[in-house]
Amino acid sequence: KLGLDDTAFSGRFGIADFARQSLRAQLKGDKLDLDRYLPAKAKQAQDAASATRKAEVDATVASAAQGNTPLPEKPTRQAWSDAPLLPIATLRKLDLDVALNFGRLTVEKLPIDDASLKLRGQGGVISLDDMRGGLYNGRFNAKANLDVRQDSAVLTATKHIANVPVERLLEAQGKKPPVKGLLDLDADIRTSGNSEKSWIDHLNGNARFSLINGVLPDANLEQQLCQGIATLNRKALAGTHGGKDTPFRELKGSLNFTNGVASNPDLKVAIPGLAVSGHGDIDLRVLGMDYRIGVEIQGDKSDMPDPACQVNQRYAGIEWPLLCRGPLELGAKACRLDKEGMGKVAAKLAGNRLNEKLEEKLGDKVSPELKDALKGLFNRK
C-alpha cells in the first residue's frame, strides 16, 4: 500500500530500470485532487487573467441584460493566463507505463467518479491511452498525446461526453451558465505551447455538440421577436416582455476551430412554437460570440404576449432576423433585432401583398404564364 497526502493507493508499483528510472504501476486509489498540485504561480496568473476580463464583461452584462439596449460589443480582454503549466524538462525524461483507478478524481474542479486511465511515456512522448469515468451522472472518455521533444509542446486529444449537464461544468469553473441542458459532445483537437493562452491561441480541430431538454435562462427571444412583429404591424408594444427562461428540446451544431476561433455554421435550436437556425463564431481567446440568427414561428400563433405583435397569416414562413454579439456569459440575452434584415422582411411582405392584389385583379382573365411573369416583377430584389 502507498500513500500520497490524503490519498491511499493499493496495487503494484515498481522500477523496471533504475538507470532509466522506468516506472511501472497498476494502482487503485480512493480519491485524488490533481488541482492541489497545480503550481502556485500558474494559479495566481490564471486568477489575474480572469479578474481582468471580468471587470470588462461585468459592465456589458449589466447593461445588456434587459434586451432593449444596443447590440453588445464582443469582449477584448484575453481570458487566459500565459504562465507556464508543464515541467517540460521533467516530462522529457519520463519512462512510464501506469494504469490508475480512482473512486473520485478531481481535475480542474470537475469530480470524476470511478475514474480509470492508462498512461505511457517514453522519449518525450506521453500518451493518455484511455481515460474514462462518470461526471455529474453522465459519462465521458478521452484520449490524448503530448509531444514535448521540441521547445513547444504539441497536444492532440479526442473527447466524448454523454448526458452531462452543461450548467454543472460551467458552475464548477465559477461561471453563471448562459445555457442549461444535457450535453453530448465529440471533439478532435490539436494545439501547442505551454500555457492556457498558447493552447487557446493555437487550438485547431472540430467538434459536434447537442444539448437536449435544456433552458436558455432569462432569454429575451420573445421580446425581440415581438418587437419585430410590432414594427411590421406599425404598432408600439404595451410593455417589455421576455426575461423568462426559454425551454428548448434540442440545441445542436458543429464547430470548426481555427487558431482559437470556433466557427459554427449550422446552429439549430428546437423551441416549442419556434424554429431557430443560425451561424456565427465563438472567439475562445476572449470568450466572445458573434452570430446571425433566424427565428420562424411555428404551431399556435395566437398566444403572443402583446396586442401589438399578434401574428397573422402573412407572417407564415417568415424568418425573423436577429444579431447576437457579446461575451458568452450573456447567452441569448446578447441578441437584438437585425434592423437591416427587418428591412428585407418588410420588402418581401410588401411584394407578397402586391402579388395577392394582382391575383385578385387578374382573376381568370389571363394565362398562368403571364400571371407568373407579372408577379416576378414585384419579387425582384
Language-model segments: residues:
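Beta-propeller and related beta-repeat scaffolds in trafficking/envelope systems
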Residues: 1, 37-124, 133-135, 147-150, ...
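Extended terminal
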Residues: 1-25, 62-63, 190-203, 237-381
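Outer-membrane beta-barrel pore domains and translocons
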Residues: 2, 28-30, 101-103, 133-134, ...
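Membrane-embedded beta-strand positions of outer-membrane beta-barrel proteins
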Residues: 11, 25-27, 98-100, 142, ...
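Extended, hydrophobic alpha-helical segments in both membrane/secreted and soluble proteins
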Residues: 11, 126-128, 138-144
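Outer-membrane beta-barrel translocator/pore domains, especially the C-terminal barrels
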Residues: 33, 153-169, 178-184, 215-217
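Short, surface-exposed coil-to-beta transition loops
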Residues: 113-114, 141, 275-277
